[in-house]
Amino acid sequence: DAELDNDTYEAAEKQYLQNNTKQAISSLSGYVSKFPNGIHALKANFYLAQSYYADGLENNSVANYEYVINKQRNEFTEQSLARLAEIHLKKNDYTKAAPILKRLEAEADFPQNVTFAQANLMRTYYDQKDYANAVVYADKVLANPKTDNKVKSDAQIIVARAAIQVNDEPKARTAYAKLLTIAKGELAAEALYYDAYFKNKDGKYEDSNKTVQKLAKDYSGYKYFGAKGLIVMAKNYYQMKDNFSATSILESVIKNFASYEDVGAEAQTELNMIKGEAAKTNSS
């Protein structure tokens, strides 16, 4: 009956409001199981979720946050959506995070929650190889003047990588050029590598080699892009008719970077091509 419902809830809420987390969990879960559709079911589920979360029991809180977001929009909807998204993202569960983030983007009143949703939808779509949507969200993130540089850098890299994946070279060039001005560490190494890569494609072989040298000197810690840069350098030497330098660089890459299978395979393909061409020239 209503009186028992009210009394049970009030006793539980009191524990919650006094920050007695363990007692709040015990009494709120008692209320929720006794009155699943009780007068205070919405508040009780939200407070129970918050208590679990505060006690480090994030997985336990999911069902109660879900109860809140499945009800008509209420004062706890936005906070529950943000919390659920955070819990799923922490576990890299992008399949569960995506629909929650979409709702948060659409329903949030706080601008920082919209920004959070857009930045994470961008990462989620990229992770799921949905490059078209990843770019849509990266563009939203970049268009937001309040986005901080770290997230802008992430957005720029996603635009660039997605463009490479879908062979949109003009977009990739622009994105990597912008990235070069803001990136640090490994992202800067990646941007420099593509700078050398596009210079090679444009026939600027000397300039491309200078960029590879800068990559090797300033970003020596990032071996993967260093190795890929050396392959570009070998291609430059080949175009400049210096087959000896080209083959010795490629042989060195194959020997020293065997742990990067894609790099080794690319170097081998390039080496086979140069040797094949040389054999043709010698036999003619």
Located regions from the model:
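Acidic, polar-rich low-complexity tracts and alpha-helical solenoid repeat scaffolds
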Residues: 1-284
